[in-house]
């Protein structure tokens, strides 16, 4: 579901600018889920670009408040969403937690 078409298009442009989107139809990527796909987006690359990470942080924060109101906490899945999740939580003045794929042993 796209909450804001302009934000989605600009984010896609930014991801393409920093080569975060990889295509390889001949040798599909294996995602953490085990799925194979010809496309991979390394969202963690955005953390190395201050202007891009700030844009994403602000747009995520605006969309969260618009769609859900002010939450009690921000959660990010390990490991790919920890960085952006922390940025959003800090920006919104909220606690942050991360979600593991399985309980810690």
Where do the model's predicted regions map?
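Short glycine-rich phosphate-binding loop at a beta-alpha junction
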Residues: 69-78
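Conserved hydrophobic/aromatic pocket- or pore-lining residues that grip, position, or stack substrates
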Residues: 34, 74, 96
């Amino acid at each position: 579901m796209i909450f804001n078409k302009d934000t989605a298009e600009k984010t896609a442009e930014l991801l393409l600018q920093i080569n975060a989107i990889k295509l390889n139809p001949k040798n599909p990527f294996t995602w953490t889920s085990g799925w194979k796909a010809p496309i991979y987006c390394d969202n963690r690359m955005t953390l190395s670009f201050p202007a891009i990470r700030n844009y994403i942080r602000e747009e995520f924060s605006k969309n969260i408040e618009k769609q859900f109101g002010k939450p009690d906490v921000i959660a990010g899945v390990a490991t790919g969403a920890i960085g952006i999740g922390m940025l959003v939580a800090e920006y919104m003045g909220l606690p942050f937690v991360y979600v593991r794929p399985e309980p810690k042993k």
